[in-house]
Amino acid sequence: MIKSLFYTFLQTKHQEESNNSRDPNYPLFPQEIEIRPIAYFPWEIIKTLTTDEIISKFQLPMEKIRDTMLRHASEEDIYRTKFMSCETNILVKDLDTNTIHQGKLWKHPCENNFALRESWIEEFVKRRRLVVGMVVGMYWDFEACMFCFSVLDGRQ
């Protein structure tokens, strides 16, 4: 979210009643507001959190990783990742709190998905108090080369 400072001429009822309404020099009242940029629906990964994702790891589908992070990799490299154990450090931006966190993206050779593990639990589940049933979304920011994360539906 973007924080902006706006100045307004509007006063509270108390300020309006206590000031002289004939005075042409009304003071400006600064007010800080948060603006979430209006954009197309960018969420490439939308998940309703399960118990496994709260206590263990956040699964990211191989197709989404291939289409985003590995889009410049050759078909041979992508084929090799299916049968190898892979681990890489990535950045994840929490759009709700405007913070950036480092995470480890990991893939086991027997699984077809990538996963965020320990860093997911510490940086997101505990810090944001995520619970089973919340809907979260992620997308890959191509300009910043990082995932962007947000809680889309916080109802429990």
Curated annotation (Swiss-Prot):
This is B3 domain-containing protein At5g26805. Residues 57-155 bind DNA. InterPro entries: B3_DNA-bd, B3_domain, DNA-bd_pseudobarrel_sf. GO terms for cellular component: nucleus. Keywords: DNA-binding, Nucleus, Transcription, Transcription regulation. It comes from the Eukaryota. It comes from Arabidopsis thaliana. CDD domains: B3_DNA. Its main location: nucleus. It is found in: Nucleus. One of its GO terms (molecular function) is DNA binding.
